[in-house]
A protein has these predicted regions:
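Short Gly/Thr/Asp-enriched flexible loops that form oxyanion-binding sites at enzyme active sites
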Residues: 57-60
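Active-site neighborhood of divalent metal-dependent phosphoester/pyrophosphate hydrolases
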Residues: 19, 46-52
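Short active-site-adjacent helix-start/loop capping segments
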Residues: 51-54, 79-81
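Active-site regions of metal-assisted phosphoester/phosphodiester hydrolases
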Residues: 1-42, 64-65, 69-240
Length: 240
């Protein structure tokens, strides 16, 4: 039997903090330059500003600078702008949906899913930004795990984003029981991603399921990445 060789892909998750850097300057073009250096095929962003009354949309500017298509999943309005998650891709997006993860009176959150057609194979990309409260994250992690486990959604799945958990807590334990977790310690000596300039916490994570292989993991620490946002990009080279 002849097996079709797996397709290599570079994926990145990056909380861009409304394009506001550690120097308190709002520069979406700086975020785009960081991502241009990463040279990823699929990009999952959190804390993204979309269209607003001024017509200035950070995701439009970043997408145009990178020459990539994009889909936004807004959770609320911030100063008149759409605000939430966004996925950019060099490959066609076949399907897009978002699931509400909001809990009680906490800030609105969502799980964004985009199905990307990679040379005839579908990769399900889940982009998430969990809350800061422990009980909130527990609810969100349980709901996330249930959504990703949907048996009607088959094929390789990758779940990545800002999980707002910096040690092996309840959320990490719950998700690791349902999904495969990328052991960053296997690839990285320094795996902390927050805050950008002097990272002391590891908030960004990658989980996956199905026929998918992880080849390489990197936290980008270029001079520009250290100031462009309060997070550092977490990069994964995979094969599907």
């Amino acid at each position: 039997m002849t097996h079709t060789p797996r397709t290599p892909l570079r994926i990145v998750t990056y909380n861009i903090h409304r394009s506001r850097g550690m120097d308190r300057r709002t520069r979406p073009e700086r975020v785009a330059e960081v991502l241009r250096h990463v040279d990823a095929d699929v990009i999952a962003l959190q804390e993204v500003l979309g269209a607003g009354p001024s017509g200035t949309s950070h995701i439009e500017e970043i997408g145009a600078a990178l020459g990539m298509g994009w889909v936004m999943a807004a959770t609320r309005h911030l100063r008149g702008h759409l605000f939430g998650n966004a996925i950019l891709s060099r490959f066609p997006a076949k399907h897009h949906t978002q699931h509400d993860l909001s809990w009680k009176a906490c800030e609105e959150r969502c799980l964004q899913r985009v199905d990307v057609d990679v040379n005839g194979r579908v990769l399900h990309v889940y982009n998430v930004h969990l809350g800061t409260a422990i009980l909130e994250r527990r609810y969100q992690a349980q709901r996330l795990a249930t959504i990703v486990a949907d048996r009607h959604v088959t094929g390789p799945k990758i779940v990545l984003g800002d999980f707002n958990e910096w040690m092996r807590g309840l959320t990490t334990t719950l998700l690791s029981a349902k999904l495969k977790s990328v052991d960053l310690g296997q690839y990285l000596r320094r795996r902390r991603t927050y805050p950008g300039l002097f990272p002391i916490l590891h908030l960004d994570h990658i989980y996956y399921d199905g026929p998918l292989e992880i080849d390489y993991i990197e936290v980008l620490r270029t001079r520009l990445a250290l100031v462009a946002s309060d997070h550092l990009p977490l990069i994964a080279d995979i094969r599907i």
